[in-house]
Structure formats: C-alpha cells, structure tokens
From Swiss-Prot:
Protein name as annotated: Cobalt transport protein CbiM
Native source organism of the sequence: Clostridioides difficile (strain R20291) (Peptoclostridium difficile)
Entry keyword annotation includes Ion transport: yes
Recorded topology in the membrane: Multi-pass membrane protein
A GO biological-process term: cobalamin biosynthetic process
GO molecular function, one term: cobalt ion transmembrane transporter activity
Residues passing through the membrane, by range: 33-53, 68-88, 100-120, 132-152, 163-183, 205-225
Name of encoding gene: cbiM
UniProt subcellular location: Cell membrane
Quaternary structure note: Forms an energy-coupling factor (ECF) transporter complex composed of an ATP-binding protein (A component, CbiO), a transmembrane protein (T component, CbiQ) and 2 possible substrate-capture proteins (S components, CbiM and CbiN) of unknown stoichimetry.
Domain of life: Bacteria
Amino acid sequence: MKQNIKLGVIAALMLIVLTPVTSNAMHIMEGYLPVKWSIAWGVIFIPFFLVGLKSIGKIVKQDPKKKVLLALCGAFVFVLSALKIPSVTGSCSHPTGVGLGAIMFGPSVMFVLGTIVLIFQALLLAHGGITTLGANAFSMAIIGPIISFLIFKALKKKDGNNAMPVFLAAAIGDLATYTVTSIQLALAFPDPSGGVMASAIKFLGIFFMTQIPIAIAEGILTVIVYNLITENGEKSILENNDKGVKANEC
C-alpha cells in the first residue's frame, strides 16, 4: 500500500509539472478539420457508439451495482483528460484515462463513456468541439480502449500480479490515441512535398515529445487505481452504494 501511495504521488507530480495553467483544446479543436473530414469521422464513429450503448445496457441489466464502477471509470477519464499540454497547432497532449475502463469492462463501454467526457468538455470547458467530436472520439474513445484491452488480454496473468499488463495497456493505449490523431491530422493536412506519410511523421514527432512521459505517468496511476478496485475497492464501492440506496428508500 505504501508503495502504491509513493508511486501515485510521483505520477501525480509528473502530470502536474508537465501541465501548464492554460491550454487550448482537446485533441483537435472546434472547426479545425475540413468539413468533409468532420463528417467522415462522425459517420465512422456512430456505429461504435451504438454498440457501446448496447454493451452498457447489458452490463447494467445483469448487475445494476456496476453503475457505480462505470461512473468511476468515466470520472477517471474526465479528470485525466482535463490535463492538457499545448502541442501541435490546433491540438494538445493530455492523458486519456480510457485504459482503466477498457480493462475492467471491455472497450465497447468506453466508446460511450469516452464520448460523454468529450461532449461535456467541449460544451462546458471549451476543450475540443462538436464538429471534431467524431474524430476525437474515434481516436480516444474507440482506438485507445481497443488497444488497451487487447494488450491487457494478451499479457494478463490468471494467477499473479497484473501491474505490468495494466501499465502497458494504459500507456500504449494512450500512445495509440495520439498515433491515430496524427494520422487524422495528416489526412486533413498532408505535407505539400511528402504527402500524408510525411505529415503524419511530423505530427507524431511533436506529439510524442510530450506524450511519452504523460503515458508513463498515466500507466502508473492506472495500475494504482486498478489495484485498489480489484483488491478491495470494488467490494467497498458496491457496499457503500447499497447503503446509499437503502438510506434513500428509508
């Protein structure tokens, strides 16, 4: 437990130090993408969102208590993704937080939770935008969780410490998000001489200067929260939720 606390403090300090007081937008800001790309990413995103809604409905129907853990995973995404570092013009770097929910519930749940976070931040915090919601959701709420889930599933141990699989899942999922964002920006703004590939490499180079340390810090925080939930947190949260429901009924 003491080791977890120490690691948590270190990771939190890394995020605080790397995050300035002011920043611009989440991933790709409002109006930055050409209309055709905004529409295209929105169309691609919608089927994933519908699958996510169905998945959440199934989880809640099977075990209503899981709503608390779903909310916790959503809050984790909201808090981490609110920390921003200006990076490429029209975009920024930040933790994503989607790995935790993908590991615990599967990637489809994060299709919805990640999108809800993006909508709230676009409307309330002026981070990101509605016209770029499809593109931002595809990178952070879809690709990031899928990669995190696949890595955790491939590396997890049935009996043993899963700290490293969780760390790698969260960190690489974070980096995957920004790899996709770089490709999205490159498709919209190809290099005049080198085309899409050259543009993507440039975006990746700028993003990863800030994103690699952020991904490491996110991986550490995700391990700590995951351990707290799986070791004793889940039971405690569900029990507290039951008490709250009973109190309201009285």
